[in-house]
Amino acid sequence: MSYSMMRSINLIVIHCSATREDKSFTEYDLDICHRRRGFNGTGYHFYIRKNGDIKSTRPIEKIGAHVRGFNSESIGICYEGGLDCEGQPKDTRTEWQKHSLRVLILTLLRDYPGCR
């Protein structure tokens, strides 16, 4: 069954985990962090580790918890990082993350035409 038949998706949202580039932050850490904030698990549908591994963290058919007002019509992708070693905002994406992000977005755009 195609996920695109289950809910109307028109938006793909990219987030960072807002974690330091010199620290590891696994998909399990992300899940714990979101549960401590009162969510029922990770709010993003996909998580991209520094090594480029794409982790499915929430079924696409399940509405996300990542961008208020747009959760019902969007897919959330989060990449590990986003802060430098001092805790300041920085594009910390590795080449592996950039590649995986491109592949994932292209796949989602194919499955959900009309997404922006």
Regions found by a protein language model. Give the residues of each.
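Active-site-adjacent loop/helix surface patches within enzyme catalytic domains
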Residues: 1-115
